[in-house]
Amino acid sequence: MSINKQQILDAVSEMSVLEISELVSMMEKKFGVSSINNNNINVNKVDESVEEKSEFDVLLLEIGKNKISVIKSVRSALSLGLKESKDLIESELPITLKTGLNKKDAESLKKEIETSGARIELK
């Protein structure tokens, strides 16, 4: 007598969770396999294929309370004159301060200007 897949499925659907767990253990032993969740392996492969961003833009989102300190920080960080720094800071927000920086330089610039009270974002 041959049992088809539908009959097996019907028999399994009538079992309790404990019985199904025991059946899985028996199948693992019989066939020398493991029921490790393969989804975790696939997720890791997808994560590896996603490239990390290599170029960043530094945006000034908010000046904060100490405008003069922000002007000085921007002037120093971007090697601008006083008037250019002031005009840049007083233009409409958000302001792109620098584009195409690597992650290390972008983080450094962000930290330098944020110490003056400004709010910076990396894109």
Curated annotation (Swiss-Prot):
One of its GO terms (cellular component) is cytosolic large ribosomal subunit. GO terms for molecular function: mRNA binding; structural constituent of ribosome. One of its GO terms (biological process) is translation. Keywords: Ribonucleoprotein, Ribosomal protein. CDD domains: Ribosomal_L7_L12 (cd00387). It comes from the Bacteria. The keyword Cell inner membrane does not apply. InterPro entries: Ribosomal_bL12 (IPR000206), Ribosomal_bL12_C (IPR013823), Ribosomal_bL12_C/ClpS-like (IPR014719), Ribosomal_bL12_oligo (IPR008932), Ribosomal_bL12_oligo_N_sf (IPR036235). The keyword Cytoplasm does not apply. PANTHER family: 39S RIBOSOMAL PROTEIN L12, LARGE RIBOSOMAL SUBUNIT PROTEIN BL12M. Forms part of the ribosomal stalk which helps the ribosome interact with GTP-bound translation factors. Is thus essential for accurate translation. Homodimer. Part of the ribosomal stalk of the 50S ribosomal subunit. Forms a multimeric L10(L12)X complex, where L10 forms an elongated spine to which 2 to 4 L12 dimers bind in a sequential fashion. Binds GTP-bound translation factors. Belongs to the bacterial ribosomal protein bL12 family. This is Large ribosomal subunit protein bL12. The lineage of its organism: Bacteria, Pseudomonadati, Pseudomonadota, Gammaproteobacteria, Enterobacterales. The gene is rplL.
